[in-house]
Amino acid sequence: MSIAIIDYGSGNLHSAAKAFERAARSLEDPQKVFVTSDPDQAYGADRLVLPGVGAFADCRRGLDAVNGMVEAITEAVRVKARPMFGICVGMQLFATRGKEHVITQGLNWIGGDVEKITPRDESLKIPHMGWNTLDVLREHPVLNKLPLGPKGQHAYFVHSYHLNAANEADVLARADYGGPVTAIVAKDTAIGTQFHPEKSQRFGLALISNFLRWKP
């Protein structure tokens, strides 16, 4: 089994790779983790990870600049039904559009727009940086046995925008930051988190481990 972390010039590749390697070691079946900017290698992997930090438009341009990568991951996920994990802006790229400064087309795997978060409490700063618990909207195998809810473990967020999904069924969990913030989305074999699981300590590691066990 192999896990490809997509390198398109954005994302905490080293941190993500280390987190997935650590989670993979906890499984009964060995899984190889590798970072790649080669579309053929990405397409050939059993699971894919799309990290991302920075502005939506910059990340989309970076992904488009890797010749054949959008086509490869779209074929792998949407046609071959291989599991994909999006992290932060990597998850946002699943959306129909991003509205950060300019309108930018996303991958359109999950209907909806990436919009600026607008806390009701004006004292809450943007970007949203820090630890939050998650409120689960629906069950999913990747959330199995995780300590969620108001008394659950915390996830680490650093962002100013979130995915406002068109279909409520595509949202697995939200956080509260002066109002609801989309935290986890999933549709078919694609799942993504607005927070950084690689920085979320034991909770993040458990979430990644569940993703690696998931057989959609």
Swiss-Prot record:
Keyword Lipid biosynthesis tagged: no
UniProt pathway: Amino-acid biosynthesis; L-histidine biosynthesis; L-histidine from 5-phospho-alpha-D-ribose 1-diphosphate: step 5/9
Coiled coil: none
Pfam families associated with the record: GATase
Domain of life: Bacteria
Keyword Transmembrane helix: no
Keywords: Amino-acid biosynthesis, Cytoplasm, Glutamine amidotransferase, Histidine biosynthesis, Hydrolase, Lyase
GO biological process: L-histidine biosynthetic process
GO molecular function: glutaminase activity; imidazoleglycerol-phosphate synthase activity; lyase activity
Protein name as it appears in the record: Imidazole glycerol phosphate synthase subunit HisH
Organism: Bradyrhizobium diazoefficiens (strain JCM 10833 / BCRC 13528 / IAM 13628 / NBRC 14792 / USDA 110)
